[in-house]
Design a protein with these regions (language model features):
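Selective detector of the "anchor" transmembrane alpha-helix that sits immediately C-terminal
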Residues: 459-483
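Selected alpha-helical membrane-embedding segments in polytopic membrane proteins
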Residues: 495-595
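Hydrophobic alpha-helical transmembrane segments and adjacent short intramembrane/lumenal linkers
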Residues: 564-568, 577-679, 684
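Eukaryotic scaffold repeat domains enriched in small/polar residues
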Residues: 28-425, 559
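Juxtamembrane boundary at the C-terminal end of a transmembrane helix
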Residues: 677-704
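Boundary/linker segments of alpha-helical solenoid repeat arrays
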Residues: 414-416, 442-457
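Hydrophobic core
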Residues: 15-23
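TPR/TPR-like (Sel1-like) alpha-helical repeat modules
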Residues: 426-448, 475-477
Length: 704
């Protein structure tokens, strides 16, 4: 495959583009559209991207040669037509999906007696394969079913047998119909799930009920209720699951839902794809605009209001955000592909978008306030992307590679392209190249699978060398252990040989913590230089871990490294513990000096230091399924060091075990207090500096 050699070049282009384009999303080509075009990289940062969709035309009543729309609240595509629910006009306008020309206006709906039926204010529409119309008549609290000639076939009212609470209205807002003509209705006042009806209008069951999300407020209220009387609990608001705000159905009969959480920060499971059993089978990702602050590990999410969701023939998701007037596109792997649209009323933007449908490769958005349907068509770049998706299921790997390479030539920031190219390499058995592509895409799970195959092939090719290396390593460990054991053993009639040299003393405490720290105090083995050396090893280990932990377990970048935080994790923590313990134990008649406390605690950190280096090295040879080994190494290092700290405090201060535990608990409390005081002092110092700076600046300005 000749073109496979281009991947290294494309990777270099991508890395260069990240350096040049990791800027505010306002850095766009102003000729592309009236809104910002961007996508997110593997680190959650917005980067410039060519426009995937641009506004093509607006469908209005005037353009179709009919009276103007009045609040088009919903649209649906069926049978080669697009049906627009013109809510306040009480009519349905059908246009041809091929050229968006007028097909027919349905404005006279009658019952069996010939009386006209009015459904003005309706919020939802569905059309079956046999041409029947299903109307969510919201104001009249009913579902109307008409045949293709607009004659009433069925009226569905509130199912009293399951909704026996007379206070709960049947305010049906959205509706979909599957291939068996089963009806799924959404009511904003009913949080038990989607109501499923048979083709004859009989209530069947609730479908896809949401659960109450466990939050700190839920836990707090639950604990508080235990102390309240029955009457008091009855007066308190009950936690109820969040309802849906919209739903749609794809060609395979899967129902997509949108949670009713207007203008709330995005979260996982806001968009769901419900299986036939009502379970969410969609990958849980965070939808919407976001920028990630890696230094504080806090995900800043812009406020948004999702109102509709649609899919195309390739499994891509299109999500409409009425709060920001944007459409977000995600591929079937959950990767953010593009965003387009906006709020301001210009071409390609909206004032009150209400519904979304995908017609072939076009995206149609109804704007209730502007009384129009805005059509977006893919650009040249967008056509390349959709064309690449169209061949994704092909067995022709060369064709798939070429398609996604063409996408990268137009946009080297497209992580979906790297993901798909990685998939091609993986299917070819080129696991090293697949790992490189998955790494750029930030696809850790796929990287792990490719690495597992690569590791297996490597071991098969180099088994003899690996076995020889393991034998040599075991021999080196054995002789090293024998040497250390000899140096740390007790010889008859002599002292501990290791204690004759304080530089090797910490090794003895690893195996003999109590005896070791007893000798530490009696023989004055403390050394500031050695203690600082161990802490320095911890500091270097943290840096080593940050940069060299395997990609499967770590996607840190060099620019995310925070030196002050790293210093606080190593030097700062141990110094703070030593100061707090010395302060507490001075009041509790402890025998240890500050030097003894500081050095003994530093010595006790040696197992954890070893675990940091071992964990980092091992992370480059393990897969995601083997992460338990890293957890075990980390836990052993922490517990071993914690045990040594207890032994150190026990021996240095000459405490009983109970006194030692109490002293450590008080030390932790003192650390919290000291930390609070440091933060308070820093805050006050900052405010004083700001005040002094403003005063001096004012004086300088007045003196001119």
């Amino acid at each position: 495959m000749s073109k496979l050699k281009n991947f290294t070049k494309l990777s270099a282009i991508f890395l260069a583009a990240v350096c040049l384009l990791s800027v505010n999303v306002s850095a766009k080509n102003p000729t592309d559209s009236a809104y910002k075009n961007y996508q997110y990289n593997a680190y959650g940062e917005s980067l410039y991207a060519p426009a995937t969709f641009l506004p093509s035309e607006k469908i209005t009543g005037k353009k179709l040669g009919i009276s103007e729309f009045n609040a088009p609240t919903d649209t649906v595509s069926a049978n080669g037509k697009i049906y627009i629910l013109d809510s306040n006009n009480g009519r349905i306008v059908a246009i041809n999906s091929s050229d968006y020309s007028l097909f027919k206006v349905y404005d006279v709906f009658v019952d069996s007696e010939g009386s006209q039926i009015d459904f003005k204010g309706a919020q939802g529409i569905a059309v079956s394969k046999d041409g029947n119309f299903y109307i969510a008549d919201t104001n009249n609290k009913r579902i109307l079913v008409f045949d293709s000639e607009c004659r009433l076939k069925l009226t569905i009212l509130k199912p009293e047998e399951v909704l026996n609470d007379s206070k709960v209205p049947f305010d049906v807002k959205k509706i979909v119909v599957n291939s068996d003509n089963q009806i799924f209705a959404l009511c904003s006042s009913i949080n038990s799930g989607i109501l499923a009806f048979s083709a004859e209008g009989k209530f069947l069951y609730f479908f896809g009920k949401n659960t109450v999300e466990v939050t700190s407020d839920i836990i707090k209220n639950s604990m508080l209720n235990k102390f309240l009387s029955k009457e008091q609990r009855a007066l308190r608001a009950k936690a109820t699951p969040v309802n849906y705000s919209n739903l749609s159905i794809d060609d395979d009969g899967f129902i997509y839902t949108v949670k009713a959480e207007a203008f709330q920060k995005t979260e996982k499971s806001v968009i769901q794809c419900l299986s036939y059993t009502g379970e969410n089978i969609l990958k849980e990702i965070e939808f919407g605009d976001y920028e990630v602050d890696y230094l504080t590990n806090y995900h800043e999410r812009t406020e948004t209001s999702f109102v509709d969701v649609g899919t195309d023939a390739y499994g891509n998701l299109y999500i409409l955000d009425s709060g920001r007037g944007r459409i977000y596109q995600y591929d079937k792997n959950g990767l953010f592909t593009s965003a387009f649209g906006g709020i301001d009323g210009y071409d390609g933007t909206f004032t009150n978008p209400t519904s979304l449908i995908v017609n072939n490769e076009d995206v149609l958005i109804s704007d209730e306030r502007e009384n129009c349907i805005q059509i977006f068509k893919p650009t040249v770049y967008g056509q390349k992307v959709l064309g690449a998706y169209s061949v994704n299921d092909s067995n022709e790997l060369e064709k798939r590679y070429d398609a996604w390479s063409d996408v990268l030539e137009l946009n080297s920031n497209n992580i979906s392209a790297y993901y798909e190219i990685g998939t091609v390499y993986d299917e070819m058995g080129e696991y090293k190249q697949a790992m490189d592509a998955f790494k750029i895409a930030g696809a850790q799970n796929e990287y792990s699978k490719a690495f597992q195959s690569y590791r297996k092939n490597f071991m098969n090719r180099n088994m003899l060398v690996i076995i020889a290396g393991i034998v040599l390593l075991c021999a080196a460990i054995y002789f090293s252990a024998s040497f250390v054991k000899k140096k740390t053993s007790v010889k008859t009639g002599t002292a501990f040989s290791v204690l004759e040299n304080k530089w090797t003393f910490p090794l003895y405490t690893l195996k003999h913590p109590v005896d070791g720290f007893e000798q530490f105090k009696t023989r004055n083995c403390e050394s500031y230089l050695l203690a600082i050396g161990i802490i320095l090893l911890l500091f270097i280990g943290d840096i080593f871990s940050f940069f060299k932990t395997g990609f499967i377990f770590n996607i840190n970048r060099a620019i995310d490294f925070n030196l002050p935080v790293t210093i606080m994790k190593s030097f700062g923590f141990i110094v703070l513990f030593a100061v707090a313990n010395w302060s507490v134990c001075t009041l509790l008649n402890g025998k240890g000096t500050f030097k003894e406390i500081f050095t003994s605690v530093a010595y006790a950190m040696l197992p954890y230091v070893f675990s940091v280096y071992l964990r980092t090295i091992m992370s480059n040879f393990l897969t995601a399924n083997e992460s338990i080994f890293l957890t075990v190494i980390n836990v052993i290092g922490i517990l071993w060091s914690a045990m040594l700290v207890i032994a150190a405090i026990y021996s240095v201060h000459q405490y009983s075990f109970g006194q030692t535990v109490g002293a450590i608990l008080l030390t932790l409390l003192a650390m919290a207090i000291i930390g609070f005081l440091i933060i308070l002092f820093y805050t006050l110092l900052t405010q004083v500096y700001s005040f002094a700076y403003s005063v001096i600046s004012e004086l300088v300005l007045k003196s001119r």
